[in-house]
Structures are given as structure tokens and as C-alpha cells.
Amino acid sequence: MLRNSIAPSRGLGSLARQRLTTSGRNLITKRSYIEGKSAAWPSGRSIASVLPARKTSCATFTTSATRGNEQNIRSPPSPSSASAISPEGISRPASSSPAGQTSPGSSVNPPEPPKAQTGAPPPPPPPPPAPKAKGRFGRSLLYLVLTAGVAYAGGVWFSLRSDNFHDFFTEYVPYGEEAVLYFEELDFRRRFPNATRHINTRPAAPRDEGEKVTIPSKSGVSWKVAENEGTSDVTHKGRHMSAVDAEVFRTGGDAKSASNKPTTEDKKGSEKTGSKKDESKERVPVTDTKKSTVSLDEPRKPAVATVSSIEPLAALQDDPIIQELTKIVNGLIAVINADESASKLAAPIAKAKDDFLKLGEQISSIKKEAHIAAQEEIKNAHKEFERSATELVRRIDEVRSEEAAEYREEFETEREKLANSYQEKIKTEVERANAVAEQRLRNELVEQAIQLNRKFLSDVDTLVEKERQGRFSKLSELSAQVAELEKLTAGWNEVIGANLTTQQLQVAVDAVHSALESESMPRPFINELLAVKSLAGQDPIVNAAISSINPTAYQRGIPSTAQIIDRFRRVANEVRKASLLPEDAGVASHATSYLMSKVMFKKEASSSGDDVESILTRTEKLLEQGNLDDAAREMNALRGWSKLLSKDWLADVRRVLEVRQALEVCFLFLLPTLSLLIYYNEY
């Protein structure tokens, strides 16, 4: 991997060196051309003023390159030289100009021309020429072509390996199918070099076409064969057109002479037959020229000699080839039967049929013999296979038993070797552990000795320090007592400030309590809460407790305990009136409940019972004891109209409980300060 990563960097380095050398040579050639042209100019200052820095750098590069590579190559002249100099690479001739070089070239830059002769400073050097884009474009095109070629070759290679990619590549990539087929053909020729050779060098067997058979025109199978032989076509001339011809044919006379003398009755019969095409097509045979036509019911006599048709071959076998041959022969027989000269070919066709039947029987017998021979060969092959399989199983068992014995011996040998090696390792580990334990004990003893020495030295130092500080012990005690007095003074100041704040806060809380309990009617206590909040400062507990109070409570006031009990008694009477009402009660139910409440007896306080009377009794008892929280819980257990009637009373009790809880939290905030005062008082 390291070699592969270094190779591209080396190639890039060599390419950079080549490009640098080429650019240097191009610059040297241009400079030589400019210096050759400068001989015709009036002065050499224009060249130096146009390209001073560029020529100097080129001269330096060229001089160092020529001095390092060739000693016989002349160094380039300075920019102030006015002589025409040939390009680099030509051997140095003798200088003939008065201003030529008298010493060999060196790497030192030539002196610049004196600036006193010029009236203005030289212009700044021109910017370097832009790099040519031609080389970059050509390189990019070359890389693109190489990449496309590699990708195309990779696609062809992968198409030969993968069927899915083969389908994609041959369908969508131009000329992909031709390339893949070409490489597949090369691979086929490489694997089978003699395949095409046998095909090309195989001599063509002579084709046995047999005797040439000529079939006359208008012969073969036709739709006319299926027509009724007893019918006649009145549109064509023939023997059916004249009864004389039929009679002559029967008597053996000349048909031609008889047909040339038609009778009047024949003409009338032909006209009648041609005019009435829908009638029967049976022609009426005539026995004599002077007699009238015979009736249609009389059977027709044949005009020509009857030709016996050749029977087609029956299907011999189920073999498709023989059946195809049978169809061909039957087709030939049908063609012959359609011809008028079928009687002439009856004997050869019959002989051919016999030969064909014999051939079919021979093929059947050959097939049977081949089938029997194949069955025998299959049986022999089965027997040979069974024998070979038995022999193979026996050999496999023998080899397996031998390998098992060898493996067992090797296993025992390896087990003994492993046991011996583990015994040696255990022995070595035990010896090492013993040595490490002994060394550890020695190290612990040395550490204990060092610790004892350190402890002894520290004890000595402690005693010396105690003796040294004995004189200053009383001074240290006095300074400590003074510091304690200062702390006590600062603490008393804090206690006094906290005491004042606590007293003020206690007064504010008591003012809130008195405002809640002393008034006969509810009144707002916003000022008292503001005083408590201002005295508490930024304490989060007190602020949270005051924020938890419902604004309606301190804006309108809350009832006192006596007012809550008095209102409960009025609400209880109304609840008793509606205690017997269901949830969906009407006017009649309200009236009935009102009348029944007049005769109901009031229960005493009981510890159990979920009826309305029991809940009201327990609530009244709790209110007399001052337990508003439990009383509110009892009233909250009501359902239906009873709970609806006591909803306002529960809201007032809830506001009272919220205010009391907030005041209790404020009182708990005062407890740490009170305990601190008690502590300092005891101290």
C-alpha cells in the first residue's frame, strides 16, 4: 500500500520537473530571439526597461542550469548586451564585440545599467503571462478519454460476469452489445479452439435427391375433388353437352365425328339446362337420336371407363416421423387419385405401399430390439453402479477408519505435548510467583523501615516546634479570645436586627389575624398583607405563601369562624330540605322533599354513615371544634342538589383555609429567628 501511494507522487514530481525544464527552455529561446533583435535598436535600455526582472531571473536560472549540467555551453549575456547571440546549446565562439564577455559565465546576476543617464525611473515589470489553457484542456480531454475507456472496459468485463449488468450494459450503452459479443466469441474460441475448425473442414455429404418427379399442371389436391362425381358442369364443353357423343362412346365409335353432328333435341336440352340452373344437375342420358330424353329418376350411366381409386395408408405407428411420412404418402395418393391417369400408377403405388408397410414393420422391430437392448444395458449399468457404490462405500469406510485411527494417534500425541508444555508453563509461573512474592516482602520491609525513620524525624521536629512555640502560647490564646469576642459582638448585632424584624413581622401577622377574627363583617386586608410582604423582604417562602392566596380573599375579605358556623346552619337547613331530591328532580319532587324535611328528626353525631343528615351532623361538630379543614372535607362528600346548595359555603371555607395556611407559613418563617434569639439568650 505504501508503494502504491508513493508511485503517483513520484509520477507527479517527474511531470513537474519536465514542465519546468520545458518552460525554462522556452524562456531562453524567447530571450535569445529578443536579444538578437535588440542589435538593430538604437540603445539597449529599452529591452532592460521592458523586461528587467524577467530577464534577470531567466539569466540566473539558465546560468545555474548550464553550470550544473554542461561546462562547454556559453552562459546567457546580460540585458545590456547589444550583440546578437545564438540560442543556448551552441559552443561558445571567440567574442568579437568590444562589449562582449571576457570571463566565463557565472551564476551572479549582471549589473544593471546606470540610472543616471535616464531621466525617469524604469517602469514596473509587466505582470506574468497567463498560463496557457491549451495544455490544460488537452490534459483534461486526455483524462476524460482515459476514464471513459477504463469505465467502458470495466463495464464490458463486469457484463461478462453478471447477467443483470449484461442486460443493462447491452441495452443502454452504445455499441455495448457488439463489444460484449466480441469478447464472448473470443472466450468461446479460447475455450474451444477446434470447434469452428471441425465445422469449416467437414466435407459436405452428397445429397440424395432421388429420381426427378414431374407433376403435371392442374394436378394435386383441390377443392374440385370434393365435388359430386355424378354432377356435371353445364358451363364447360364436354360429353355431357351431347347425347350423341355418349352413345358413340358406348358403341366404340368415333367421338369426334359424332360430336360434329348434334341433333335438334340435344340443342334444346342444352338450352333448357343452361336456362334453368336451379334444377337438378343430373344430365339425362339419351339412348337414341330420334327418341326423347329419359326421365331424371333413371340412374346415370358412366360416360367414361370407371377408374379405381387407391386406398390411402393407415397410421402404422405412433412415431411422429413415420406419421409424417404416412401423411406425405397419403397426400401423393390423393394427388394421383385426382388425376385421370390413376389406373396407370395403381400397381407402382400398391408396391410402394407394400414396401412402406414392410419398412414400418422393420422400423418397429428395430425399435423393439433397440428398446430391449437399452433395457439390458440399463440393467447392467444399474448392477455395475450398485457394485461400484458398494465398493466405494467399503473403501470410504476403510479410509474413514484409518483416518480415525491416525487422528486418534495424533490427538493423543498432541494432548501429551500440550500437557507437558502446560506443566512446564505452570512450573515456570510458580517459580516466578514465588520470586515476585519474596521480592515484594523485601520491598515492604524496606518501605516500613523508611516510614519508621520518617516518623521518628517528624516526632523530633514536632517536639522541637512545641518547645519553640511554648513562649508564644499565651499570646495565641489571648488573640483567639479577642477574635471570639469580636464574633460575639457581630452576632449580637445581627440578632438584635433580626429580633426587630421578627417583632415587626409578628406584629403584622397578628394584625392580619385580628383583622380576620375581630370584624363582624368581612373586610379587605390588603394593607396588612403588604406590611407582611415588605417586612419579609425577598424571602421566596413568604412571597410564595402570599401569592397562593386568592385575590378575591384579600380584596373583599373572608368571613370569621362564627360567621362560617352561622352560615353553615342556614345552609344545612336548605340541604336537609333537598336531601331527598334525586339529580333529575322536578317541581313535585321539590315540594315532596320540602314537606318530608319538616317531619324528619335530627340525628346526633355519629362516626359512620354516608347519608346527608350524618354528614351535616359531623360537619357541625367539627366546626364547633374549630376544625375547618375536616368540616370542608365532610361537606365536599355530598352529592347532587346537596352539594350544589353548599357550593358557595365551600368556596368561602376554602378561601379561609388558604389564608390561614399562608399565615402559618409566615409563622414558620419566624421560628428559626425565634430559636436563634433563644439560643443567644441562653448563651
Curated annotation (Swiss-Prot):
Mitochondrial matrix face residues: 12-139
Gene: MIC60
Region described as Disordered: spans on this chain: 61-134, 199-300
Compositionally skewed regions (Basic and acidic residues) per UniProt: 263-300
Subunit record text: Component of the mitochondrial contact site and cristae organizing system (MICOS) complex.
Source species: Trichophyton verrucosum (strain HKI 0517)
Membrane topology (UniProt): Single-pass membrane protein
Entry's Gene Ontology cellular component terms: MICOS complex
Compartment(s): Mitochondrion inner membrane
Protein name: MICOS complex subunit MIC60
Record-annotated disulphide pairs: none
Keywords: Coiled coil, Membrane, Mitochondrion, Mitochondrion inner membrane, Transit peptide, Transmembrane, Transmembrane helix
Signal peptide residue numbers: none
Family statement: Belongs to the MICOS complex subunit Mic60 family.
Mitochondrial intermembrane side: 161-683
UniProt feature, compositional bias: Polar residues: 61-74, 93-109
Record field: compositional bias (Pro residues): 110-131
Pfam families attached to this UniProt entry: Mitofilin
Extent of the transit peptide: 1-11
Function: Component of the MICOS complex, a large protein complex of the mitochondrial inner membrane that plays crucial roles in the maintenance of crista junctions, inner membrane architecture, and formation of contact sites to the outer membrane. Plays a role in keeping cristae membranes connected to the inner boundary membrane. Also promotes protein import via the mitochondrial intermembrane space assembly (MIA) pathway.
Coiled coil regions, renumbered to chain: 367-444
GO biological-process terms attached to the record: cristae formation
Positions of transmembrane segments: 140-160
Lineage: Eukaryota, Fungi, Dikarya, Ascomycota, Pezizomycotina
